[in-house]
Curated annotation (Swiss-Prot):
It comes from Encephalitozoon cuniculi (strain GB-M1). Residues 350-361 have a biased composition (Acidic residues). InterPro entries: DUF3654, UPF0329. This is UPF0329 protein ECU02_0080. Belongs to the UPF0329 family. Disulfide bonds: none annotated. Residues 326-335 have a biased composition (Basic residues). Residues 321-384 are annotated as: Disordered.
């Protein structure tokens, strides 16, 4: 026999394949005393997110497989929440406690599942809103009488007392002590179910976290949300506990165990903006035991300083607009002073350019024969890289690329049509990214997904979230960089470089460390000569700049004949700050 509650949390996973709770494949957490579970309103399958806090049923309808899996998941969501927050009694001698739970809570949960499924399908609510309703219905904190939890707790106490009276006299002393300890803990567990103040606090904090998650997902652009979720996607405790093979076809929620009184106090003291930042840090992988009063105060200071900077920036822009308006009015009053007004506007424009230049972290660099602007970081600050011929190949015309691939040894590219080559050139001809990868700021943009061995060589993969814009088409995804070390110099050689279009749902797999082991090229020709990235001459019309305001690195392709025409741009997003 064993009892699982606050000291051991047994978390069941919904097996979509069999429509059942897979209790034999569960994860046991050991939270600190006083910590409670906060469930994050994201549903995962394997590495991928299939439901966001903002997801509505109409969104799920776009993917039939997700609708089926989610419906099955909702049929068990109360059991999952119960296991996270309350815990279960496991008595191995017989199933009396299991039968008691089914009798007192099981039928109630079944009715609850039907109600919330109907509410979600027929209504226009979000998943985070649905999760808040599930919490309210499970714990029934607004009821003073006839709470299902309280009645269930009373029955546990009664059953425990009966078991205490009926302990056989022939049971030896060791087993008697063990049973006595179990029954004492069991009685406390039953009593705790009537502690409405505790469950009310859990429900309140869960609502606060759900609201923060929904606001994060609503406020951020798709690429900003992707960089946030990508950063934390490899830090999921539950996925690590189950392992890759056991969880690929299962739906699960993630949670954090922490002192929820601190979150409640922080919300009262600092408000929603600080809670929102705290939840962001949790999504980035912050552990529950690391969240204390000192850390919360630190986050509050960061948020307050950020808000102060934003206010100052808004004031500067407002004053600048007012000065512009005054300048134009003065120009209209003086018919003779038209040229003077133009000169004033020109000076104003120059001032703006200077201010923008002061804000830029690294000034724009025009390459391909153009003079580099002063202030650029010296070559000594940059990392040395080499470029493999298979990467440089994409700089050539589609006809030449096809000819070389057809003669090459890589099966995946041989025999591709010219149209396919033209399409792939858009995603592979991004050598300008190496300008960022060489810089000291590379780690601010790229995540290292780790090293692996394939085809007899050790390789490394870096990824960054990006946005590729071509005409009116905007594509979000990841910039992938594959490298190995040149022998004997040890200099990194970039053999793979591309922009991979992906959405939030598939992003987990793409940034997963195991992804390149399946998708990467089997064999690399390591005997070829590699070109030094620092000596590479970029074509006319390609421009690189770091945009500090949006924390992004941008490559802009312009028409060489008309540089005012932008053909394509790639913006690499900076990684979100970890506090």
């Amino acid at each position: 026999m064993r009892w699982i509650s606050a000291t051991l949390m047994l978390i069941p996973i919904v097996n979509v394949m069999h429509c059942s709770l897979e209790l034999e494949e569960c994860v046991i957490f050991k939270p600190r005393e006083g910590d409670e579970a906060i469930v994050l309103p994201f549903i995962f399958r394997g590495n991928n997110i299939i439901v966001l806090p903002t997801t509505k049923y109409s969104d799920l309808m776009k993917n039939t497989e997700n609708v089926k899996g989610f419906t099955l998941f909702l049929n068990h969501i109360s059991h999952v929440i119960w296991s996270f927050t309350v815990g279960d009694i496991v008595y191995t001698d017989d199933n009396r406690f299991e039968r008691l739970f089914d009798e007192k809570m099981g039928s109630y949960f079944e009715d609850l599942h039907k109600d919330i499924l109907s509410l979600y399908v027929q209504g226009n609510g979000t998943f985070s809103g649905l999760l808040k309703i599930v919490y309210e219905r499970i714990f029934q904190c607004k009821r003073r009488r006839n709470r299902h939890m309280s009645r269930y707790g009373s029955d546990i106490i009664k059953m425990t007392e009966d078991m205490t009276k009926l302990v056989p006299s022939e049971v030896d002393e060791r087993k008697r002590r063990k049973l006595a300890a179990f029954l004492v803990a069991n009685k406390k567990y039953g009593e705790s179910l009537s502690n409405i103040a505790r469950w009310r606090r859990i429900v309140e904090v869960e609502k606060i976290v759900c609201d923060a998650c929904e606001k994060i997902c609503s406020d951020l652009k798709e690429e900003e949300l992707m960089r946030l979720l990508a950063e934390g996607s490899m830090r999921k405790a539950l996925r690590k506990g189950l392992g890759r093979d056991k969880i690929n076809y299962r739906l699960y929620l993630e949670c954090i165990f922490t002192d929820i009184r601190l979150l409640s106090d922080a919300h009262k003291k600092y408000g929603g903006d600080v809670i929102k930042e705290l939840v962001k840090q949790i999504l980035l992988g912050k552990k529950g035991e690391e969240i204390d009063r000192e850390y919360i105060d630190k986050v509050a200071r960061v948020v307050q300083e950020r808000q102060k900077r934003e206010i100052e920036k808004s004031m500067k822009e407002l004053l600048r607009d007012e000065e512009k308006a005054k300048s134009k009015k003065r120009g209209k009053r003086k018919s003779v002073g038209v040229s003077g007004a133009k000169e004033e506007e020109k000076k104003e424009s120059e001032t703006e350019e200077v201010e923008a230049g002061e804000e830029a972290e690294m000034p724009s660099v025009e390459v391909g024969g153009a003079r580099r602007k002063t202030g650029k970081k010296s070559e000594g600050d940059q990392k040395r890289l080499k470029i493999h011929s298979r990467v440089l190949r994409w700089r050539k015309s589609p006809e030449k690329i096809k000819k070389e691939w057809d003669r090459g040894s890589e099966e995946r590219w041989r025999g591709r049509s010219l149209e396919e080559i033209k399409e792939q050139k858009v995603f592979h001809d991004i050598v300008g990214v190496l300008e960022l990868l060489k810089s000291p700021d590379a780690d601010r943009f790229f995540m290292d997904t780790g090293k692996y061995t394939k085809g007899g060589s050790e390789r490394q993969r870096m990824v960054a979230i990006g946005v590729l814009e071509r005409g009116e088409k905007k594509m979000t995804g990841v910039v992938e960089v594959g490298m190995f070390k040149d022998s004997p110099s040890g200099c990194p050689v970039v053999y793979h470089l591309m922009f991979r279009v992906t959405g939030i749902e598939e992003m987990g797999n793409v940034v997963n460390p195991e992804f390149p082991e399946v998708s990467d090229v089997e064999k690399i020709d390591e005997d070829k000569e590699y070109q030094d990235a620092g000596k590479f001459v970029y074509p006319k019309g390609v421009k690189f700049e770091t945009v500090k305001e949006t924390d992004a690195f941008q490559i802009v392709w312009k028409n060489p004949s008309d540089t005012s025409e932008v053909l394509q741009s790639l913006t690499v997003q900076c990684r979100p700050p970890v506090i």
